[in-house]
Design a protein with these regions (language model features):
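Conserved alpha/beta-hydrolase catalytic His-Asp/Glu region
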Residues: 33, 150, 168-229
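Flexible "cap/lid" loop of the alpha/beta hydrolase fold
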Residues: 124, 128, 135-169
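Alpha/beta-hydrolase fold catalytic core
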Residues: 1-45, 69-70, 108-109, 286-295
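Catalytic active-site module of serine/aspartate enzymes centered on a nucleophile-bearing elbow/loop
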Residues: 260-295
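Conserved HGGG/HGGXW glycine-rich cap/lid loop of the alpha/beta-hydrolase fold
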Residues: 31, 36-82
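Acidic catalytic loop of the alpha/beta-hydrolase fold
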Residues: 242-246
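Conserved acidic catalytic loop of the alpha/beta-hydrolase fold
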Residues: 93-111
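Short beta-strand/loop motif that positions the catalytic acidic residue
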Residues: 231, 237-239
Length: 295
């Protein structure tokens, strides 16, 4: 068809091509922990936390811009990706303990924390329990504020199906659920996640990750108004127009409970705004993280 444009192929490597970055592993409290790192160690530290069933590749489109200003770490969280699995149901306290062990391992006393979905839940709890270690906080379509049975069932069903039978179709269904634009294939992200889910024992690992979709376990891990009210770090709550886990009103409600929190809305994005519209995300994210710092 005349004038038709061939869609630009999207890949993790083209996102990282030309970026001075490192992939590696370190010991965080006895847990072999995978990371992606970019930026000078002399810069302030920024740690990026992905969502349930995810991995560090969630942030491949953000490393280059953030590395100009921060020693930037995207990690595979406890029990996720290629990081060690403890072999028990995972609750927020377990993730926070692993996160603080990671900060100790890289020698970072105080950091900027930015988390998406589950990562935002963990980051918020870390800011409550360890206020001296969190300089600034970003909650990106963060979980942990409510228990929506339908959303919980959807996450559990899609995630367990992808882990039990990691075919192209089941893994792609899990990835597309995150995104506002369902027309794209997201092939490289699908392939990366498929390889993770094909690891021996990953069905059991996914069961442990999905513990927070159990109503009883989730209830004892939720953050309430009192918890959010104890956050002292400057906070950005970033939400999207098409988030599949919670509407914009929930994002605004979270922001209203955190003293002095800023709220920003990105349109045309789902649950991965840092990937779906990296340019807009980076501008908002860095604008907040760098506010008041020397140029």
């Amino acid at each position: 068809m005349a004038g038709a444009r061939t869609p630009e192929y999207e890949s993790i490597w083209t996102d990282l091509q030309g970026v001075a970055f490192e992939q590696g592993y370190l010991d965080a409290g006895g847990v072999r922990t995978r990371y992606l790192h970019a930026g000078s160690a002399e810069l302030p530290t920024l740690v990026l936390l992905h969502g349930s069933g995810g991995h560090a590749e969630a942030y491949v489109r953000n490393l280059a811009t953030h590395a100009e200003h921060f020693s930037t770490w995207a990690i595979d969280m406890l029990g996720h990706g290629y990081t060690g699995r403890p072999g028990h149901p995972l609750e927020i306290t377990h993730y926070v303990a692993h996160l603080t062990a990671f900060l100790d391992a890289i020698g970072a006393e105080k950091v900027c924390l930015s988390g998406e979905s589950l990562g935002g839940w963990v980051a918020a709890r870390a800011a409550v329990d360890h206020p001296g270690r969190v300089d600034r906080l970003v909650l990106n379509t963060a979980g942990g504020s409510q228990a929506d049975p339908e959303v919980m069932r959807r996450i559990l069903t899609l995630s367990m199906a992808a882990a039990a039978e990691p075919t192209w179709e089941t893994v792609r269904a899990r990835i597309r659920w995150l995104m506002a634009d369902k027309s794209k294939g997201y092939d490289d992200i699908v392939a990366s996640r498929q390889r993770i889910y094909r690891q021996p024992g990953f069905v059991d690992a996914m069961r442990d990750i999905m513990a927070l979709q159990d109503p009883v376990i989730r209830a004892r891990n939720l953050l309430g108004a009192e918890d959010y009210g104890r956050i002292t770090a400057p906070t950005l709550v970033l939400w999207t127009s098409d988030d599949p886990t919670a509407d914009v009103a929930e994002g605004r409600r979270i922001a209203s409970m955190i003293p002095g929190a800023r709220f920003e809305l990105m349109t045309g994005c789902g649950h991965w705004p840092q990937y779906e519209d990296a340019k807009t995300f980076d501008a908002l994210h860095l604008g907040f993280l760098l506010e008041g710092r020397d140029a």
